[in-house]
UniProtKB/Swiss-Prot annotation:
The gene is P. Its EC number is 2.7.7.7, 2.7.7.49, 3.1.26.4. Mg(2+) binds at D448, D515, D516. Residues 201-365 are annotated as: Spacer. Terminal protein domain (TP) is hepadnavirus-specific. Spacer domain is highly variable and separates the TP and RT domains. Polymerase/reverse-transcriptase domain (RT) and ribonuclease H domain (RH) are similar to retrovirus reverse transcriptase/RNase H. The polymerase/reverse transcriptase (RT) and ribonuclease H (RH) domains are structured in five subdomains: finger, palm, thumb, connection and RNase H. Within the palm subdomain, the 'primer grip' region is thought to be involved in the positioning of the primer terminus for accommodating the incoming nucleotide. The RH domain stabilizes the association of RT with primer-template. Residues 656-788 are annotated as: RnaseH domain (RH). Residues 358-368 have a biased composition (Basic and acidic residues). It catalyses: DNA(n) + a 2'-deoxyribonucleoside 5'-triphosphate = DNA(n+1) + diphosphate; Endonucleolytic cleavage to 5'-phosphomonoester. This is Protein P. The record marks Y96 as: Priming of reverse-transcription by covalently linking the first nucleotide of the (-)DNA. Residues 327-355 have a biased composition (Polar residues).
Length: 788
């Protein structure tokens, strides 16, 4: 219970007790651990051992945490040098010493479906976010290009060819699903699936004009792209010589084979018209050529290496695939035989059944495995480089599924180095925010998006900056890849817009984080029906749900963002605590551990730290090792402290009641004296043993007031004290101060209104005029999550 100060406190027994505590706090401050004990001792070697080497870990679980903390300040951990040290701490290892991936020649490429959301979602889910997503844009400041042959990382030196083959299958699967563009030439790519509205203006559209030339309608503008005006001739009936001469002219013309998008019209544009491809069908012939030949013949700029004769082209094609030669000869025969009257085209297929404004490669009957239906040609407002910007390799899909492969895309050049970009920030809830927004006592359902990043379309010009290759073909990401720092921001915008509409339309509490949706409602039966309606609503818009990770029915206990959440509390799974205790037990006292290994260990401790009675200052010695990149050695007492933290497990309440207690205790300090004042009129003045910085003297008095009176809140005129950021203080004093002041609120009061300002200057306290405010920053919560 709070013990109010009395007027005669300075004459009582408790004054001597308070002075004793003050001297202990001053000793903690004066033993400057940060400069003497934790600075990098570069002269230390492996023979330096901690005093508690070999002692078994038997922490006294019943001992107060404060006793364990004080023991850790006596038996200190040590920093070492940069010599090689242990890279393994239990099951943890240094980030660069992680277990290497094992190549699996039986890796299967996972099923990847076409994720094409309907643009009607812009009207169904009104949000300003869509202007950033339809399409998304990616403009790096500068780009480093790599050769196509370096497209697959040499992750598995013994299985290079097999690795590249599986990567090629994976990329082809992504291309078939409409996620990648495939390069045809410098100005032309092809893709599959349904085109977006902004792609329609770049699709290749060919139209026949009366004089026989071909025009390409690009960017909504039709223009004649002939390089040389053909000599017009008068049509004569039964002109057999013209037909015969046409074959010779075609074979000798340097632009004999014309692409689907003809930028430079040749002398014999009727041939060009017959080679045009529309809607997955062939116009003018039944024969086709493969995608590799298309890269040579579909270039619309006339810059293809076609200076050789038609016969040489035919021979070159025949060496690669035997059916290419048959295509060329048959197409020529169709050109010469299929002309019944000059100036007209005779199609061997019904062109009325072909959809408009569509181009695809023609396919031969003998090459049915290479047939590409539902393919489109696109010439964007950019050039498509025959180089790459990212590299690829394969790993296991996860630790539980080693039969399927996962494609890892390395676009790290855009996040570090000379090409580093500053990606936009977005709201992400921390643990404190999550506690305050989750509704209490409601059943919950979790939904998970399937292939979430592949829902986000990119502008074609941006796609050309995200080039990858399997060593054979060059692909460009048509949808957002996972290896770019912009993708999480885009996904946040995407799911936030959907979550807002779901909450409004279905009257259900909705929270989204990346690809996870959390739905809550007081009525479990109603929530169950809502979840089915939400899934149907999303699927109608082309948004895919991963039902394997979706909660089938409302539950009270759910795992979300790594936390176990029930109706009233949040906690950490017991299995995680057991793993962490096992790691701590395997710490060898006095052994030197590499800082990368310590870095991983600190990451695990940080995740569970809010669920313990500890604070971040307890990890400061390990942070010092990480910052200075030196080895770290655990002491026996420090290992016991870490183990003690994992034993005092607690659960955090959802929607904690926020109370604003009235301040009854105030503190103040000068370089030589400190004072504590109570609202009842009692006060006490203390003399410091030495002059220190004023912010340290202020913190000493606040800690003393907490030890002696145990108030719910304290007034102080020091912003340093009120912000509770004590990283610059000596480690053991900062750790104790953080431990003492974390449970209570500190209010800032201006010095002229501070009731303890008078006693510290030998004047009576004044509680009549009191103005104070908390300096803690209010937690930001989105407006749509505030009203529940």
């Amino acid at each position: 219970m709070p013990q109010p100060l009395k007027q005669s406190l300075d004459q009582s027994k408790r004054l001597r007790e308070a002075e004793k505590h003050l001297r202990e706090l001053e000793n903690l401050v004066d033993s400057n651990l940060e400069e003497e004990k934790l600075k990098p001792q570069l002269s230390m070697g492996e023979d330096v051992q901690s005093p508690g080497k070999g002692e078994p870990l038997h922490p006294n679980v019943r001992a107060p945490l404060s006793h364990v903390v004080r023991a850790a300040t006596i038996d200190l951990p040590r920093l070492g040098n940069k010599l090689p040290a242990k890279h393994h701490l239990g099951k943890l290892s240094g980030l660069y010493q992680m277990k290497g991936c094992t190549f699996n020649p039986e890796w299967k490429v996972p099923d990847i479906s076409d994720t094409h959301f309907d643009l009607q979602v812009v009207n169904e889910c009104p949000s300003r976010n869509w202007k950033y997503l339809t399409p998304a844009k990616f403009w790096p400041k500068s780009i480093s290009y790599f050769p196509v042959q370096a497209g697959v990382k040499a992750k598995y030196p013994d299985n290079v060819m097999q690795h590249e083959a599986i990567v090629g299958k994976y990329l082809n699967r992504l291309y078939e699903a409409g996620i990648l563009y495939k390069r045809i030439s410098k100005h032309l790519v092809t893709f599959k699936g349904k085109p977006y509205n902004w792609e329609l203006q770049y699709l290749v559209k060919q139209h026949q004009v009366p004089d026989g030339t071909t025009t390409s309608k690009i960017n909504g503008r039709a223009e004649n792209r002939r390089r040389r005006a053909p000599a017009k001739s008068i049509s004569r009936p039964h002109d057999s010589e013209r037909d015969c001469n046409m074959v010779g002219q075609i074979s000798n013309n340097r632009s004999s084979i014309r692409p689907c998008a003809n930028n430079g019209g040749g002398k014999h544009s009727s041939t060009t018209g017959r080679l045009a491809c529309w809607g997955g069908k062939t116009i003018g012939t039944d024969q086709s050529y493969s995608s590799r030949d298309a890269s040579a013949s579909v270039d619309s700029r006339g810059r293809s290496k076609s200076s050789r004769g038609f016969s040489s082209i035919s021979r070159r094609k025949a060496t690669g695939n035997h059916h290419h030669c048959s295509y060329v000869t048959n197409s020529v025969e169709a050109t010469t035989r299929g002309r019944s009257t000059p100036g007209k085209q005779v199609f061997t297929r019904d062109s009325s059944s072909l959809p408009e404004s569509r181009a695809s490669r023609a396919c031969d009957k003998d090459s049915s495995p290479q047939e590409e239906e539902n393919a489109w040609y696109l010439r964007g407002n950019t050039s498509w480089p025959n180089r790459i910007t990212g590299k690829l390799f394969l790993v296991d899909k996860n630790s539980r599924n080693t039969t399927e492969a996962r494609l890892v895309v390395d676009f790290s050049q855009f996040s570090k180095g000379k090409n580093a970009m500053r990606f936009p920030r977005y709201w992400s809830p921390n643990l404190s925010t999550l506690r305050r927004i989750l509704p209490v006592g409601m059943p919950r359902i979790s939904l998970d998006l399937s292939q979430a990043f592949y829902h986000l379309p990119l502008n074609p010009a941006s796609s050309s900056r995200l080039a990858v290759s399997d060593g054979q073909h060059v692909y460009y990401f048509r949808k957002a890849p996972m290896g770019v720092g912009l993708s999480p921001f885009l996904l946040h915008l995407f799911t936030t817009a959907l979550g807002s509409e779901i909450a409004r339309r279905f009257n259900v509490w909705t929270f989204t984080y990346m690809d996870d949706f959390l739905l809550c409602h007081p009525n479990a039966r109603h929530l169950n029906s809502i979840s089915h309606a939400v899934c149907s609503f999303l699927q109608e818009l082309g948004i895919r749900i991963n039902f394997d990770k979706t909660t089938p029915s409302p539950v009270n206990d759910i795992r979300f963002l790594g936390y176990q959440i029930d109706q009233k509390f949040m906690k950490i799974e017991e299995s995680r605590w057991i793993e962490l205790r096992t790691v701590i037990k395997k710490i060898k006292i006095g052994a030197w551990y590499d800082w990368k290994c310590i870095q991983r260990f600190v990451g695990h401790l940080n995740f569970v730290l809010p669920f313990t009675k500890g604070n971040i200052e307890m990890l400061k010695p390990m942070y010092a090792a990480i910052t200075n990149k030196v080895n770290f050695s655990f002491s026996s007492a420090y290992r016991t402290l870490l183990y003690k933290l994992t034993m005092g497990v607690c659960k955090l309440a959802i929607r904690p009641k926020s109370s604003v207690p009235l301040p009854r205790v105030a503190t103040d300090a000068t370089p030589t004296h400190g004072a504590i004042s109570h609202i009842t009129g009692g006060s006490a003045v203390f003399a410091f043993s030495k002059v220190r910085d004023i912010h340290i003297q202020e913190l000493l008095m606040v800690c003393l007031a907490k030890i002696m009176i145990k108030p719910r809140c304290i007034l102080s005129d020091s912003t340093f004290v009120c912000h509770k950021r004590y990283q610059t203080l000596p480690w053991h004093f900062a750790m104790l101060a953080k431990q003492l002041l974390s449970p209570i609120q500190l209010y800032f009061v201006p010095s002229k209104y501070n009731p303890a300002d008078g006693p510290s200057r030998h004047r009576p306290p004044d509680w009549t005029a009191l103005t104070y405010t908390p300096l803690s920053k209010a937690i930001y919560i989105p407006h749509r999550l505030c009203g529940t």
